[in-house]
Amino acid sequence: SASPLSHLLPLLCSALLAPTRDRRGQPAMDEEYDVIVLGTGLKECILSGLLSVDGLKVLHMDRNDYYGGDSTSLNLNQLWKKFRGEDKPPAHLGSSKDYNVDMVPKFMMANGTLVRTLIHTNVTKYLSFKAVDGSFVFSKGKIHKVPATDMEALKSPLMGLFEKRRARNFFIYVQNYDEADPKTHQGLDLTTLTTKELIAKYGLVDDTVDFIGHALALHRDDRHLNEPALDTVKRMKLYSESLARFQGGSPYIYPLYGLGELPQGFARLSAVYGGTYMLSKPECKVEFDMEGKACGVTSEGETAKCKKVVCDPSYLTNKVRKIGKVARAIAIMSHPIPNTNESHSVQIILPQKQLGRNSDMYVFCCSYTHNVAPKGKFIAFVSAEAESDNIQSELKPGIDLLGPVDELFFDMYDRYEPVNEPYLDNCFISTSYDATTHFETTVTDVLNMYTMITGKTIDLSVDLSAASAAEEEY
């Protein structure tokens, strides 16, 4: 069934603490705001929530008539319209409203920055989560489970016995490593020692190095090998902390009803703190003063004044540059992905070296157990940073793992990053969503933007064990 949140949200947002309204009952455009946010993607909604909590007067507009922007979840009819034009979906796929298909398929690290942000802002009370069944890696033509326990590690065919002993010594070093306690560093300075040099001290073979970098540290490519090892060690620690958090088969969690719930949760937060929302606002043209600083936004002939503008790249196309493309396949299936222990939610990482690519490919699958499809249906995604224009052949290694599919859709979108100087023009533009299957890069961008906008940093070192609100639903 469709999420209860999606029906209530527009009503809540318009009812809660909205500013003065004009004769048509619309929020007044002729007001001055501290910040106008354009686009209701996840990044923009987190920011409008955080800024509203800070006491800033926020107006949030979107040219679409739905929340989520590029990071929305579509029902079956919307999915069909986007990829197949006017055709109606076949009846055997079930009810349209039972589908919530993510446009940016990502899982959440259970101990990661997005979960910490949700707890910090108390948005957890608007959402329900469930652990993800399994995390797998593609190696030598086969799918292997990424070990989640010592016993699984001992039995795993990913490494031979002697290699397992060497790897265990390395894992113990990582587990004990505390940046603030030099006694745990064993005389190594991980801010200068590269990842390659650190791993070499343990004599691990290339396949293990590949596994550590891509399946545990979740790097997208191999640049990390020549960069300081501290980042990789922190990423490995995040993986193991996330894994330990729910004693599940993976370090990931995922919201019931899909990722479209996340922007809506933060939109509710903003509304509770006095933020104003306007959807279906065509054009949304940013206005600049004589000094080139953003000073307002015009839509339908009315201008709302502001001190700062926050937006996604599509609202200020002359201030961003293209940095790549994401290739993606979306499959509707009637079975779990083969060779994944019948998992109803799963991630498979295909490291670049296994495919002869320059960056990893990701397979992501969820199903009716997370309320994103009717009973018996599974939604699978294959995504990668595009390295060619032939999307079907490029994604073939991932699609081949899926088994028979009921429907298959292909999509490619450009990725952009800002090139402006925010302190000169007061425009704060988010970076497009990448191909990774988790939200760490997403939230890093948001927190950096928050600091640029406010000059403050958010302390996310919350005690997660105290976050009972988040735990109840697991």
For each feature predicted by the language model, list its residue ranges.
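Short polybasic linear motifs
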Residues: 16
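N-terminal glycine-rich phosphate/pyrophosphate-binding loop and immediately adjacent elements
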Residues: 25-162
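Short amphipathic alpha-helical segments embedded in low-complexity Lys/Glu-rich regions
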Residues: 64-69, 73-78, 132-137, 213-218, ...
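Rossmann-like flavin
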Residues: 102-105, 111-245, 251-257
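Mid-domain catalytic core of redox enzymes
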Residues: 253-255, 264-268, 272-275, 281-408, ...
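C-terminal catalytic lobe of FAD-dependent flavoproteins
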Residues: 378, 388-474
